[in-house]
A protein has these predicted regions:
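Domain-level signature for soluble enzymes in the chorismate/prephenate branch of the shikimate pathway
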Residues: 2, 9-120
Length: 120
């Protein structure tokens, strides 16, 4: 097997299925299955981030004032929503809130760059 490549159970495939589709980590019996599942989820997360960043491009296009890009009230709301959703799913709220803080900051930076690029 090539370095960095893992055997994938044919029943799991390498497809880009919907989150939660046909993946049951409780049924895994090998680290190959775990790694293939994580790799699949990572691809889905990146695809979702591409959609999120497309929304940031739309926001940059719509906003007329660069100062409107950073909205601390909206940032707090987004992070609180993520924390609440995480806790409802049994995940550690603080960990998810920290991750979302980084995601929102990266999104704001991206939106500012897009604003500058398109409004220059």
């Amino acid at each position: 097997m090539e370095k960095g490549r893992h055997h994938v159970n044919p029943r799991q495939g390498r497809g880009r299925g919907l989150i939660g589709s046909a993946m049951n980590p409780e049924s895994y019996s090998t680290m190959e299955q775990v790694r293939a599942g994580v790799d699949n989820l990572d691809r889905q997360i990146v695809a979702l981030l591409a959609q999120r960043f497309a929304h940031m491009r739309a926001a940059a296009r719509i906003k007329q004032d660069r100062g409107a890009v950073r909205d601390e009230a909206r940032k707090a709301e987004v992070i609180a929503n993520a924390r609440e959703e995480a806790e409802q799913l049994g995940l550690p709220g603080d960990v998810i809130a920290n991750l979302w803080d980084q995601l929102v900051e990266a999104s704001i930076g991206y939106e500012m760059d897009e604003f500058d690029r398109t409004k220059a």
